[in-house]
C-alpha cells in the first residue's frame, strides 16, 4: 500500500523525462555523489553496462582529443565482467560470454588480475586506459591487492593512461565505504 501511494504521488508530480531536462531530485543526487566521491561531475545511466560503455567511450574520446586516433586500447582483466553490450562484452575477460558474439570490438587487452608485470607488458603506444573491478565477482570472488592498485595508479600516471574502476557491484556502500576504491587510498580517473 505504501509503495502504491508513493508511486501515485510521484506520478502526479513527474513520472519520467530525459536527462536533458533539469530535474531537482536528480540534481540533489548528483550533488551527493560528488560530495562522497573524487568527482565533480555525474553522468546518470540506466544500467551497469551503460555506465561501463560510457567509461570506454569517454576514455577513447579523451585520448583521441589529446593524442589523436592512435591511442584506443584498454587493458582489462581476465575473469572480469563489465556488461552485455558489444563493447562491454568485448571488455569482459571471460571467453564464455564472447561465444556467439564474435567478432568482438578490437582494442581490449586481457591481463591476469593482480599481475603487475602482465599490465606493464601490455602497455604500448596504443594504450589509453586500464579498466578493472576492484573485487571481481562474476568469475569468482577475487579481491585486488592494495599494492597492485597503487601500482596501477602509478603506471597510469606515468604513461598518461586513465584508470577506470567498474564499481557496479562494489559501489554505494557495499564494501563498508561509499565506494570500494576508498579502501585503496587512491582515486580513479
Which residues make up each language-model segment?
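Conserved N-terminal phosphate-binding loop of PLP-dependent enzymes in the Aspartate aminotransferase
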Residues: 1-189
